[in-house]
Amino acid sequence: MAHAAQVGLQDATSPIMEELVIFHDHALMIIFLICFLVLYALFLTLTTKLTNTSISDAQEMETIWTILPAIILILIALPSLRILYLTDEINDPSFTIKSIGHQWYWTYEYTDYGGLIFNSYMLPPLFLEPGDLRLLDVDNRVVLPVEAPVRMMITSQDVLHSWTVPSLGLKTDAIPGRLNQTTFTATRPGVYYGQCSEICGANHSFMPIVLELIPLKIFEMGPVFTL
């Protein structure tokens, strides 16, 4: 989960998020290299007294600064396209959960368990217990198994929302009249937090998402819900 004054990404809890972290480091390395070379060239330009004002054509240099950026863009685009394909890939899910966005709470439907439906509201400060997180904890958590592919069906009943859990690398828009889907496989148990990431009105910041991921064997004994 996130920490105060955190600069980096949250700890990855799914294969997709691990790929995103690797791609982030890959792109950041290229950006740092470009910035270093540009600053070094500026430093040499400002400090040296050697100038040549008679050069009007330099085919070799023009070729280099045309081909080199193209190569850099390819080095960034190829892994990005691979991750984009992986995020859109829908594997055979073991469980399907439907999430419906409202102003300003979420409704969840466990379609594989007798159509269990419940709402998830943010806990007001007066109801927080020791250890609860302000503006992030909810009255009803979504309980899911780890090491099992889960499909989330996401939509909205009023305005645009976005169902987002950073640790899992998930961000899917909830659009009225449209049903979007995404899949994920959590790699370790724990409690993971997210929020609506689409400005949806006055209480947009009061739409947290809490996933409680438990071992598959425990989940198979019977879904444990915090209702």
From Swiss-Prot:
It comes from the Eukaryota. GO terms for cellular component: mitochondrial inner membrane; mitochondrion; respiratory chain complex IV. Keywords: Copper, Electron transport, Magnesium, Membrane, Metal-binding, Mitochondrion, Mitochondrion inner membrane, Respiratory chain, Translocase, Transmembrane, Transmembrane helix, Transport. InterPro entries: CcO_II, CcO_II-like_C, CcO_II_C, Copper_CuA, Cupredoxin, Cyt_c_oxidase_su2, Cyt_c_oxidase_su2_TM_dom, Cyt_c_oxidase_su2_TM_sf. It is an enzyme of class 7 (translocase). PROSITE patterns: COX2 (PS00078), COX2_CUA (PS50857), COX2_TM (PS50999). Cu cation A1 binds at H161, C196, C200, M207. GO terms for molecular function: copper ion binding; cytochrome-c oxidase activity. Residues 1-14, 88-227 are mitochondrial intermembrane. Mg(2+) binds at E198. Residues 46-59 are mitochondrial matrix. It is found in: Mitochondrion inner membrane. It catalyses: 4 Fe(II)-[cytochrome c] + O2 + 8 H(+)(in) = 4 Fe(III)-[cytochrome c] + 2 H2O + 4 H(+)(out). Its cofactor is Cu cation. Its EC number is 7.1.1.9. GO terms for biological process: ATP synthesis coupled electron transport. Cu cation A2 binds at C196, E198, C200, H204. It is a multi-pass membrane protein. Pfam families: COX2, COX2_TM. The chain crosses the membrane at residues 15-45, 60-87. Belongs to the cytochrome c oxidase subunit 2 family. Component of the cytochrome c oxidase, the last enzyme in the mitochondrial electron transport chain which drives oxidative phosphorylation. The respiratory chain contains 3 multisubunit complexes succinate dehydrogenase (complex II, CII), ubiquinol-cytochrome c oxidoreductase (cytochrome b-c1 complex, complex III, CIII) and cytochrome c oxidase (complex IV, CIV), that cooperate to transfer electrons derived from NADH and succinate to molecular oxygen, creating an electrochemical gradient over the inner membrane that drives transmembrane transport and the ATP synthase. Component of the cytochrome c oxidase (complex IV, CIV), a multisubunit enzyme composed of 14 subunits. The complex is composed of a catalytic core of 3 subunits MT-CO1, MT-CO2 and MT-CO3, encoded in the mitochondrial DNA, and 11 supernumerary subunits COX4I, COX5A, COX5B, COX6A, COX6B, COX6C, COX7A, COX7B, COX7C, COX8 and NDUFA4, which are encoded in the nuclear genome. PANTHER family: CYTOCHROME C OXIDASE SUBUNIT 2, CYTOCHROME C OXIDASE, SUBUNIT II. NCBIfam families: CoxB. This is Cytochrome c oxidase subunit 2.
